Design a protein with these regions (language model features):
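Anionic-ligand binding patches
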Residues: 2-5, 11-197
Length: 197
């Protein structure tokens, strides 16, 4: 069984990744489970940069494959804010209820056709031999007028999908994994890993 360390402390992301890779013969551990405690400064200018920064930092402490992601929300009307600062938007200690309400307020009076947005996820892998792989995928939607749903996390409750007629937080985990930016990026990474392992 191949060991993969996922560079995150976010239990929601870890759960999502374990669900998506559940059909693979891999053991997925968090940094904490692997006994790795490293402070990582995510100062990249792109999602891909930040994913690689994290993966490289963890790979320096293990012989296992390391996966790291960086993801966030881009709102076109707000010049792609919050972007790579999605987790730190309004401060890292600010709740997502407050962040989500702030974004809805900033879009007050903006018509639906100008509320376009996307979730972006870049996933980087550093293999035991030092090779690096990167994938990037998106999930397109728009910012709604209200918070709805309890199945997601982060910005999911304000991110709406026309094809489902609901927010990302109202999807079942299976629906979300099938279409999400992280799900698509992980499946693309899975394909790359299968070619090189």
């Amino acid at each position: 069984m191949t060991k993969i360390i996922f560079a995150t402390g976010n239990k929601d992301k870890l759960r999502e990744i374990k669900e998506i890779l559940s059909d693979c013969d891999v053991e997925i551990q968090s940094m904490k489970e692997a006994g790795i405690n490293v402070d990582i400064v995510e100062d990249g200018k792109t999602f891909e940069d930040n994913a690689l920064i994290k993966a490289r930092a963890i790979a320096a402490h293990t012989d296992a494959i390391v996966l790291a992601d960086d993801s966030g929300l881009e709102i076109d009307y707000l010049n792609k804010e919050p972007g790579v600062y999605s987790a730190r938007y309004m401060g890292e200690d600010t709740s997502y209820d407050i962040k989500n309400n702030n974004l809805i307020e900033r879009l007050d009076g903006v018509p639906k056709e100008k509320r376009t947005a996307r979730f972006v996820c870049a996933i980087a892998a550093v293999l035991a031999d030092g090779r690096e792989l990167v994938t990037r995928q998106t999930m397109e939607g728009y910012i709604g007028w209200e918070i709805a749903g309890a199945n997601g996390f982060g910005y999911d409750p304000i991110f709406y999908l026309d094809e489902y007629g609901c927010s990302s937080a109202e999807l079942t985990p299976q629906q979300k994994n099938a279409i999400s930016h992280r799900g698509k990026a992980l499946r693309a990474m899975k394909e790359l890993l299968m070619k090189v392992l």
